């Protein structure tokens, strides 16, 4: 079997996992989608769509739904994990007994480890050792647009160049899904995780009616925060100007398809965090990532004023307008 035709298993049947499964199977190559809920998997297999998250988008013929985790893992050497960051470690532990030397592990989860602020790469290496090639897939992608076949570009980061090229060839589709490769896994992971925090700030600003100027300032200073933290952890600063950095940040901060932006808008309008998350009805990664990003910045001794103020709002009871005042009242400095 050629590299391009080799199967891929996607672990996680939420909106983004399903969208990636649809995109990767459009080229006719075998793709498997596993979800933790057997009833939901049976419904998807029967209806040939994910009616809950992506209604009216039919599954390509090459996409098969798997409810048995062992079977799903054994069907492919390439495993693409697409689950919320707070259950990522649990999924790694669940697949561990089924792994063989041939397996390669990729994730599109955007976040940091709950409670520690560690990169997900560190979690994987601690749980599984260094025997499996690793990669991370990240960039400006909304699930609905990706599933609908609209043009999308994304970054695939791996330290093993051969693995990166092989998986790029497997998932790249010139018609709608363009994949760039990068060797900076640290930078790509951080860009995907912390952009959600900045998106909350941009949403808060818009919710308070501060306008486009303020939103743009938050995006610009936000990428500066992410870059400072990334460089302190060994990332390449140029990574943050790419798809997984600035690209993902701009998308998430400016379009209402972003849950994190919508969450921030509700905060800016005076809605409390729990009510806002309940109304959105899906995981708001930025809520969880804010605490971890703040912890990581403190550990590294990096100044991240936007992240700090969002942390104060979410976890210390600070009013959104007070947070905005604190940012605007900071001492003038050279850019």
Curated annotation (Swiss-Prot):
Q: Which GO terms describe its cellular component?
A: cytosol
Superkingdom is Bacteria
Name the positions where sn-glycerol 3-phosphate binds.
110, 139, 141, 195, 248, 258-260
Glycoprotein as a keyword of this entry, yes or no, is no
Pfam families, sorted: NAD_Gly3P_dh_C, NAD_Gly3P_dh_N
Stored Gene3D superfamilies: N-(1-d-carboxylethyl)-l-norvaline Dehydrogenase, domain 2, NAD(P)-binding Rossmann-like Domain
Enzyme class per UniProt: oxidoreductase
> Where is this protein localized, as stated in its record?
Cytoplasm
Question: A GO BP term, please?
Answer: glycerol-3-phosphate catabolic process
Instruction: List the active site.
Output: 195
Q: Where does NADPH bind?
A: 15-16, 36, 110, 143, 259, 283, 285
Q: Which pathway does UniProt place it in?
A: Membrane lipid metabolism; glycerophospholipid metabolism
**Catalytic reactions on record:** sn-glycerol 3-phosphate + NAD(+) = dihydroxyacetone phosphate + NADH + H(+); sn-glycerol 3-phosphate + NADP(+) = dihydroxyacetone phosphate + NADPH + H(+)
Listed A to Z, the keywords are: Cytoplasm, Lipid biosynthesis, Lipid metabolism, NAD, NADP, Nucleotide-binding, Oxidoreductase, Phospholipid biosynthesis, Phospholipid metabolism
What EC numbers are recorded for this enzyme? 1.1.1.94
A Gene Ontology MF term for this entry? NAD binding
Kinase found in the keyword field: no
What's this protein's function?
Answer: Catalyzes the reduction of the glycolytic intermediate dihydroxyacetone phosphate (DHAP) to sn-glycerol 3-phosphate (G3P), the key precursor for phospholipid synthesis.
Query: What is stated as this protein's family in its record?
Result: Belongs to the NAD-dependent glycerol-3-phosphate dehydrogenase family.
Q: What is this protein called?
A: Glycerol-3-phosphate dehydrogenase [NAD(P)+]
The record lists the organism as Mannheimia succiniciproducens (strain KCTC 0769BP / MBEL55E)
């Amino acid at each position: 079997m050629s590299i391009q035709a080799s199967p891929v298993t996607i672990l996680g049947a939420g909106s983004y996992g399903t969208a990636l499964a649809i995109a990767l199977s459009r080229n006719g190559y075998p793709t498997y989608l596993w979800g933790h809920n057997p009833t939901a998997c049976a419904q998807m297999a029967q209806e040939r769509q994910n009616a809950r998250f992506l209604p009216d988008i039919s599954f390509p013929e090459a996409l098969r739904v798997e409810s048995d985790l062992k079977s799903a893992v054994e069907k492919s050497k390439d495993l693409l994990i697409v689950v919320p960051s707070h259950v990522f470690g649990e999924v790694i532990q669940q697949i561990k007994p089924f792994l063989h030397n041939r397996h390669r592990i990729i994730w599109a989860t955007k976040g940091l480890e709950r409670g520690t602020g560690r990169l997900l790469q560190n979690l994987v290496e601690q749980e599984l050792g260094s025997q499996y090639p690793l990669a991370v897939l990240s960039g400006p992608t909304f699930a609905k647009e990706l599933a609908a076949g609209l043009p999308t570009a994304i970054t695939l980061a791996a330290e093993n160049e051969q693995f990166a090229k092989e998986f790029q060839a497997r998932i790249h589709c010139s018609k709608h899904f363009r994949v760039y490769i990068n060797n900076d896994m640290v930078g790509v992971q951080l860009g995907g995780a912390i952009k959600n925090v900045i998106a909350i700030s941009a949403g808060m600003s818009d919710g308070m009616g501060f306008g486009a100027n303020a939103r743009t300032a938050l995006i610009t200073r936000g990428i500066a925060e992410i870059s400072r933290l990334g460089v302190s952890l060994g990332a390449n600063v140029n990574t943050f100007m790419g798809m997984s950095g600035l690209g993902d940040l701009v998308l998430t901060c400016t379009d209402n398809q972003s849950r994190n932006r919508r969450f921030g808008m509700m905060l800016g309008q005076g809605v409390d965090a729990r009510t806002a998350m309940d109304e959105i009805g899906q995981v708001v990664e930025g809520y969880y990532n804010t605490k971890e990003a703040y912890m990581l910045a403190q550990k590294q001794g990096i100044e991240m004023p936007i992240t700090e103020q969002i942390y104060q709002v979410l976890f210390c009871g600070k009013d959104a307008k007070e947070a905005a005042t604190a940012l605007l009242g900071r001492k003038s400095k050279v850019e």
